[in-house]
Amino acid sequence: MQSVVFPNKILPYLLVAPQIILTVIFFFWPASQALYQSTMREDAFGLSSNFVGLANFSAVLSDESYLNSLKVTVIFSVLTALVSMGLALLLATAADRVVRGKGFYRTMMIMPYAVAPAVAGMLWLFMFNPAMGTLSYILRRNGIMWDPLLDGNQAMLLVVAAAAWKQISYNFLFFVAGLQAIPKSLLEAASIDGARGSRRFWTIVFPLLAPTTFFLLVVNTVYAFFDTFGIIHAVTGGGPAKATETLVYKVYNDGFVNLNLGSSAAQSVILMVIVIALTAFQFRFVEKRVHYG
């Protein structure tokens, strides 16, 4: 295999410079500022600040409301990942069997991914609004008292549904690509041997989708931790009674609403460490069970 040699020694650095600049500006600089702010205590107007060391971290980790947000985040992330990946795999399997109009169905499935998180949240809020929502009216007609603005469990179900619906399209794309990469000869051979559809799926298709599933597991975890702020802010605002206040929403609430910048910065640092540790754990242990090829 012939190696690529750049005639100009500066050219490789120029090619990677835009990515490095963006990474420094949008990751390393904010991360360093958050780390610095987490060791300071400022007044509400930002006129004075004092170095307090790890006092902000100690206060955050001993705060019951923060521990509640951690529990809410775990529940929300697990449910969102399971629902979005499960439905995406089901829809991808169904779309892969379509003979006519396959491109149309796949295009329609991808469209929800273009919807902004806040817009996705508002769509679901309108459908399940206890006062004027069509689906909430159907629930009440069937004897189900639906009011996510007062019931924390119902609020959690609503934000999970909105977040999962938003992410299904992304997962669908990768599952369809994974299904197309599976040799049809394997499925035909299993069919000749008498294996039914469900058996072929669980013994052949699903194991071969393990790399795709693992990748999506990492992506969906990061998505649930960071990219669902707009949905929660639009639908519940972290309520009722902080039942849907995730870690990222608490960072916003304490920093921009309560103006407790030191605590908010400490929470953002802890959140960053949690996501890095969780991703490293998934790559370290989960990937061992993934077989490529």
Curated annotation (Swiss-Prot):
Residues 66-282 form the ABC transmembrane type-1 domain. Keywords: Cell inner membrane, Cell membrane, Membrane, Transmembrane, Transmembrane helix, Transport. It is found in: Cell inner membrane. GO terms for biological process: transmembrane transport. The chain crosses the membrane at residues 10-30, 72-92, 108-128, 156-176, 204-224, 261-281. Its main location: membrane. It is a multi-pass membrane protein. One of its GO terms (cellular component) is plasma membrane. Belongs to the binding-protein-dependent transport system permease family. PANTHER family: BLL4140 PROTEIN (PTHR43227), SN-GLYCEROL-3-PHOSPHATE TRANSPORT SYSTEM PERMEASE PROTEIN UGPA (PTHR43227:SF9). The complex is composed of two ATP-binding proteins (UgpC), two transmembrane proteins (UgpA and UgpE) and a solute-binding protein (UgpB). Part of the ABC transporter complex UgpBAEC involved in sn-glycerol-3-phosphate (G3P) import. Probably responsible for the translocation of the substrate across the membrane. This is sn-glycerol-3-phosphate transport system permease protein UgpA.
